[in-house]
């Protein structure tokens, strides 16, 4: 098809042969190709339309990216051919090379191709996109490559960086091609700044391919020099030691000969350098300097060139202009950049209102000038959190001895509008006036609007604008004032309403470029009916009542409820992350635990909490060997709710289910009929472990101090060490002085009557317990004396062995609970009680603790949790297992070896505590703990609970740290306890037929279901119990001293051992004083206040 007005195009077969002939015969061939508008570069505005025309003596065509875009070809009357390319709605992607060539020539002829480069600055596109394969650049040692990070705006300053390195590389940059040079095997990123935003290019990866060739690099000390300065160019060759240098430079043909200097770089192998030095350069020395290197062995050649410019004098040239007015938003940071070229390096000074600016000490103004290339500089003014006072006239001046340049602009600080005042008044004229005043920059616009049929203007409904109202209804007056000292405009507008018949909402709205602000006021008639006032008052009272009820309901829901912390596991999922707990209310209750209320005489309150209290009492008939026994009774307060009564009954059933153990506060009996529920447990006269450690800390520290003396001075039996005075009772501020536990007393009643008792009520003043006095002065009464063969030593001195012994006993008790699949959930030193002879027992006295005032418990919803003692899985996933108790045991160890310290003393109980636990933070080694003890703590604090040691393993680990005497004494006391007529042992025997065949507490196998026949209608209940195993997995039976802790294989009533409930009194003569034993010679311990390491020969306490 032939285009009208054009000649038929030659056929493609002979087109390449006819084209030179046409060029020679054409009368305009000498003119060649002509591009309109001429190049070589054009900068187009984004979204504009542009027309390119190419003409020549033969058919021409436009090409881009090896393709021919859509274009229009024509032939004029004088025989000239032309092609028109229309670029419509240009974007940054239109940036690139455009070629005009003769159709079918493919650029074969020298004059048959002409190039034009077009830039389309696009603020959203810093760098032109590249194909993925262009991101990987392969080179040889002699190959110069180009990193093609091309920009859409030639005015942008582009720097090349190694990835994650802020220092730019001194590589020449071409806006049309990118960075060209020799690169190392690294990852490179191009950077530029568009406005206030720094833009990074894609990462380019350079890989070198090793070839046996020479590699040449050329660099100059300066590529720009002034006339009369020296030119020094270095040509460096790597990879070969026998090369020939040939230089080509501008004035070589005119007869100026320069002898280069060649030397070896001895500190770098295979590096040869040739230096071309031209002193006193002249203008004619400007041009290209070429270093040609050759070697004759493999006939390898390589050459590199560099351009050097000689200027007559120095210069300073600004690149690009800033708008005359620059804007900054109030309290936002603003950076202003000026780009310029200069040689030699200039001095840069910034001025504000003709006053020199310096770096502000407060960091509010930052000035910096950086050299991005040899002669290009960027000077930046940064205003941090712009203030109104920083508006003004700014000037940047760059100068040196030869030239100077400066750029000035005005900075305007835009301030968001704000309505400062909206008020109404009632002038004497009868009108109602509304006045609105506001400020902002740039000048705000004020509009008035009303909602005539509503009391206020809803945001979703457009109000009625004022301004078109008639003169009879309203009158508007607006004044605008500029305040130079505040650099902002103030608008004051007055609206006069001539008649208001009903309440009317009037809105004043201010807006400018940064947003808008509004306020509303309700205009009421002069004579507002009394009915409206009454209705408003009633509505306000109703709203206040509803709000008060909501607050009361929320407070009632947040009130903590008592719940038993101990849980019995019924089954475990296959992955070990889901546990099903036994419902305690479904456990049977054996009536053999019942004790008639008339056999119990209540005394004073030992501890009182938010839900209940613990009372000292005397029980009659609990033991065959003792007519009376001092006990502790747990009960609820009279204000207890039904759910709390149910929780106390659950605690009773769990305690009766567990059975007796030496290191657990054992159940002795209960009163559940004919009155409130009483749980009767063992009485521990020395209170909780925290308070015990605080009271006896001075004896421990004194003992450690004495151990630094020669061993001959250290005699420790049942008496105090030499030089240590008898400890007098010292009451520390905020601590109890040997009390049952550290609890607040919220009642002033010292003696608790038996409530709701059938028959006669007994009130008795129980003999004042000596636990309130220093226990070293305590002398047991005749009924309380115990057989010395089974009593534990009652030395008042606290030793390192005692600390390890406490830990060992708690581990034994927790091993027993774990064998019963019981999870404690609140294991802490405050829930460990101290009995005669430093025997410890695990308990849970949350009932009698005011947890709402106890700083150890943190409110979480409607409950209080001991977060500092809880394992991570319990805090974050509410997962409680025996292994989460292991974590708490590690915290308890830290308490013991800090002598009663509070865990995590350096962490506040807020988000910082939770974050520290998630990051794996653990407490440091206590001062009094040995490395072995701290290693046990760290094992207990493993992040994954599956790899924490079980309590059976913890017993073995702690057992190794104790002397043989201690372990034998403990085993003897445990066996005596199990052979005694202790009420807990006797009732467990009566409750379980076939008593000698009870399971070992070390049996931690999976849960089976064994039928138990209770006395009162519970025959259908199946209670979960561990199944028996013939042997223990951890080793021979006799290897664990805790084996006998709950084994009831020998039954007799020869003696009774209970916590503070001694045996039947026996008549025995007063012991004669024994001669003082000879002191043993022991190595002197290290001078460490912690007294680490148990020393059996120096410790005769406990056990």
Swiss-Prot record:
Q: Identify the keywords attached in UniProt to this record, alphabetized.
A: ATP-binding, Cell membrane, Chemotaxis, Cytoplasmic vesicle, Developmental protein, Disulfide bond, Glycoprotein, Immunoglobulin domain, Kinase, Lysosome, Membrane, Nucleotide-binding, Phosphoprotein, Receptor, Repeat, Signal, Transferase, Transmembrane, Transmembrane helix, Tyrosine-protein kinase, Ubl conjugation
Does the keyword Lipoprotein feature in the UniProt annotation? no
Give the transmembrane ranges. Answer: 533-553
* Domain Ig-like C2-type per the UniProt entry, residue ranges: 33-120, 129-210, 214-309, 331-403, 416-524
Q: What is this protein called?
A: Platelet-derived growth factor receptor beta
Q: Where is the Protein kinase domain?
A: 600-962
Instruction: Characterize the regulation of its activity.
Output: Present in an inactive conformation in the absence of bound ligand. Binding of PDGFB and/or PDGFD leads to dimerization and activation by autophosphorylation on tyrosine residues.
User: Where is it located?
Assistant: Cell membrane; Cytoplasmic vesicle; Lysosome lumen
* E.C. code: 2.7.10.1
Looking up CDD domains in the UniProt record yields:
Ig (cd00096)
* Broad class of where this protein is predominantly found: membrane
Glycan attachment residues as annotated in the record: 45, 89, 215, 230, 292, 307, 354, 371, 468, 479
Compositionally biased residues, Polar residues: 1039-1059
Q: What does this protein do?
A: Tyrosine-protein kinase that acts as a cell-surface receptor for homodimeric PDGFB and PDGFD and for heterodimers formed by PDGFA and PDGFB, and plays an essential role in the regulation of embryonic development, cell proliferation, survival, differentiation, chemotaxis and migration. Plays an essential role in blood vessel development by promoting proliferation, migration and recruitment of pericytes and smooth muscle cells to endothelial cells. Plays a role in the migration of vascular smooth muscle cells and the formation of neointima at vascular injury sites.
PANTHER family with a match to the protein in the record: PLATELET-DERIVED GROWTH FACTOR RECEPTOR BETA, TYROSINE-PROTEIN KINASE RECEPTOR
Membrane topology of the entry = Single-pass type I membrane protein
For this protein, the record's SUPFAM superfamilies field holds: Immunoglobulin (SSF48726), Protein kinase-like (PK-like) (SSF56112)
Post-translational modification remark: N-glycosylated.
Bias (Acidic residues) occurs at: 1065-1075
Q: Where is the composition biased (Pro residues)?
A: 1076-1086
Give me the disulphide-bonded residues.
54-100, 149-190, 235-291, 436-508
Recorded catalytic reaction(s): these are: L-tyrosyl-[protein] + ATP = O-phospho-L-tyrosyl-[protein] + ADP + H(+)
Task: Give the similarity note.
Answer: Belongs to the protein kinase superfamily. Tyr protein kinase family. CSF-1/PDGF receptor subfamily.
Which GO biological process annotations does it have?
Answer: angiogenesis; cell chemotaxis; cell migration involved in coronary angiogenesis; cell migration involved in vasculogenesis; cell surface receptor protein tyrosine kinase signaling pathway; platelet-derived growth factor receptor signaling pathway; positive regulation of calcium-mediated signaling; positive regulation of cell migration
Residues bearing Phosphotyrosine are: 562, 579, 581, 686, 716, 740, 751, 763, 771, 775, 778, 857, 934, 970, 1009, 1021
């Amino acid at each position: 098809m032939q285009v009208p007005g054009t000649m038929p195009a030659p056929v493609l077969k002979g087109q390449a042969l006819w084209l030179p002939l046409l060029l020679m015969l054409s009368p305009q061939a000498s003119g060649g190709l002509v591009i309109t508008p001429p190049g070589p570069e054009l900068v187009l505005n984004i979204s504009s339309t542009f027309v390119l025309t190419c003409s020549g003596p033969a058919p021409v065509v436009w090409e881009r990216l090896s393709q021919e875009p859509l274009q229009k070809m024509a032939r004029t009357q004088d025989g000239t051919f032309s092609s028109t390319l229309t670029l419509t709605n240009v974007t940054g992607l239109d940036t690139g090379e455009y070629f005009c060539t003769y159709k079918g020539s493919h650029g074969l002829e020298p004059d048959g191709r002409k190039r034009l480069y077009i830039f389309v600055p696009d603020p959203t596109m810093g760098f032109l996109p590249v194909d993925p394969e262009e991101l990987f650049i392969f080179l040889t040692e002699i190959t110069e490559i180009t990193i093609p990070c091309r920009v859409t705006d030639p005015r942008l300053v582009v720097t090349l960086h190694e990835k994650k390195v802020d220092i730019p590389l001194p590589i020449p940059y071409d806006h049309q091609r990118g960075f060209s040079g020799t690169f190392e095997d690294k990852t490179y990123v191009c950077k530029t700044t568009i406005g206030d935003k720094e833009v990074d290019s894609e990462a380019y990866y350079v890989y070198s391919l090793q070839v046996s060739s020479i590699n040449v690099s050329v660099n100059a000390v300066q590529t720009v020099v002034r006339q009369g300065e020296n030119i020094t160019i270095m040509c460096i060759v790597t990879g070969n030691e026998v090369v020939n240098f040939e230089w080509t430079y501008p004035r070589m043909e005119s007869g100026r000969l320069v002898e280069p200097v060649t030397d070896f770089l001895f500190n770098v192998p295979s590096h040869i350098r040739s230096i071309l030095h031209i002193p006193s350069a002249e203008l004619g020395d400007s041009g290209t300097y070429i270093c040609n290197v050759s070697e004759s062995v493999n006939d390898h050649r390589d050459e590199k060139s560099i351009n050097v410019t000689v200027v007559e004098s120095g210069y300073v040239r600004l690149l690009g202009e800033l708008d005359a007015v620059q804007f900054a938003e109030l309290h936002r940071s603003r950076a202003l950049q000026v780009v310029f070229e200069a040689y030699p390096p200039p001095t840069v000074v910034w001025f504000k209102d003709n006053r020199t600016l310096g770096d502000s000490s407060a960091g509010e103004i930052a000035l910096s000038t950086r050299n991005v290339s040899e002669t290009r500089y960027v000077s930046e003014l940064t205003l941090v959190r712009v203030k109104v006072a920083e508006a003004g006239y700014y000037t940047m001046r760059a100068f040196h001895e030869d030239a100077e340049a400066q750029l000035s602009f005005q900075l305007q600080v835009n301030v968001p509008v704000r309505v400062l005042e909206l008020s109404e008044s009632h002038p004497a004229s009868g009108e109602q006036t509304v006045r609105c005043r506001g400020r902002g920059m740039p000048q705000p616009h004020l509009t008035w609007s009303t909602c005539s049929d509503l009391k206020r203007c809803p945001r979703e409904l457009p109000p009625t604008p004022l301004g078109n109202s008639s003169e009879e209804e309203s009158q508007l007056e607006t004044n605008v004032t500029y305040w130079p000292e505040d650099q902002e405009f103030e608008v004051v507008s007055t609206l006069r309403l001539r008649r208001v018949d009903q309440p009317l909402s009037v809105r004043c709205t201010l807006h400018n470029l940064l947003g808008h602000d509004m306020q509303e006021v309700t205009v009421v008639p002069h004579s507002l009916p009394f009915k409206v006032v009454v209705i408003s008052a009633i509505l306000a009272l109703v709203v206040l009542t509803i709000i008060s009820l909501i607050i009361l309901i929320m407070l009632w829901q947040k009130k903590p409820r008592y719940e038993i912390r101990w849980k019995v596991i019924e089954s475990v999922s296959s992955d070990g992350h889901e546990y099903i707990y036994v419902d305690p209310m479904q456990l049977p209750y054996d009536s053999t635990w019942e004790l008639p209320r008339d056999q119990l005489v209540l005394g004073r309150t030992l501890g009182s909490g938010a839900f209940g209290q613990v009372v000292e009492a005397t029980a009659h008939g609990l033991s065959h060997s003792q007519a009376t026994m001092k006990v502790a009774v747990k009960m609820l307060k009279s204000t207890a709710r039904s759910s709390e009564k149910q929780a106390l009954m659950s605690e009773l059933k769990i305690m009766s289910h567990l059975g007796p153990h030496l290191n657990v506060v054992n159940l002795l009996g209960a009163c559940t009929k004919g009155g409130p529920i009483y749980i009767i447990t063992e009485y521990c006269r020395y209170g909780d472990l925290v308070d015990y450690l605080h009271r006896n800390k001075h004896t421990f520290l004194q003992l450690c101090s004495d151990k630094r003396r020669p061993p001959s001075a250290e005699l420790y039996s049942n008496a105090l060490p030499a030089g240590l005075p008898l400890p007098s009772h010292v009451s520390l501020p905020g601590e109890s002085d040997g009390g049952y536990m550290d609890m607040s007393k919220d009642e002033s009643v010292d003696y608790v009557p038996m409530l709701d008792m059938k028959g006669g009520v007994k009130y008795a003043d129980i003999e004042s317990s000596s636990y309130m006095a220093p226990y070293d002065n305590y002398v047991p009464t005749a009924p309380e004396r115990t057989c010395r063969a089974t009593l534990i030593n009652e030395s008042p001195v606290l030793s390192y062995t005692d600390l390890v012994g406490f830990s060992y006993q708690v581990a034994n008790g927790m091993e027993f609970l774990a064998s019963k699949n019981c999870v404690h959930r609140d294991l802490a030193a405050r829930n460990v009680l101290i009995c005669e002879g430093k025997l410890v027992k695990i308990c849970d006295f949350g009932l009698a603790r005011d947890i709402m005032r106890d700083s150890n418990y943190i409110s979480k919803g409607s409950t209080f949790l001991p977060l500092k003692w809880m394992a991570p899985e319990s805090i974050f996933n509410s997962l409680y297992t025996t292994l989460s108790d292991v974590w708490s045991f590690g915290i308890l160890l830290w308490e013991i070896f800090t002598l009663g310290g509070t865990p995590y003393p350096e962490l506040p109980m807020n988000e910082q505590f939770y974050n520290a636990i998630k990051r794996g933070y653990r407490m440091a080694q206590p001062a009094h703990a040995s490395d072995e003890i701290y290693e046990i703590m760290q094992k207990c604090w493993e992040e994954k609970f599956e790899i924490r040691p079980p309590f059976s393993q913890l017993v073995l680990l702690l057992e190794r740290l104790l002397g043989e005497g201690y372990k034998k004494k403990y085993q003897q006391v445990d066996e005596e306890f199990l052979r005694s007529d202790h009420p807990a042992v006797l009732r467990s025997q009566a409750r379980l037929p076939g008593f000698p065949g009870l399971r070992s507490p070390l049996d931690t196998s999976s849960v089976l279901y064994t039928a138990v026949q209770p006395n009162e209608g519970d025959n259908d209940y199946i209670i979960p119990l561990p199944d028996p195993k013939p042997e223990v997995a951890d080793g021979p039976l006799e290897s664990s001293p805790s084996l006998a802790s709950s084994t009831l294989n020998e039954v007799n009533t020869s003696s009774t051992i209970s916590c503070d409930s001694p045996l039947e009194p026996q008549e025995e003569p007063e012991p004669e004083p024994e001669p003082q034993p000879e002191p043993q010679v022991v190595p002197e311990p290290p001078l460490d206040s912690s007294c680490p390491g148990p020393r059996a020969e120096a410790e005769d306490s406990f056990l």
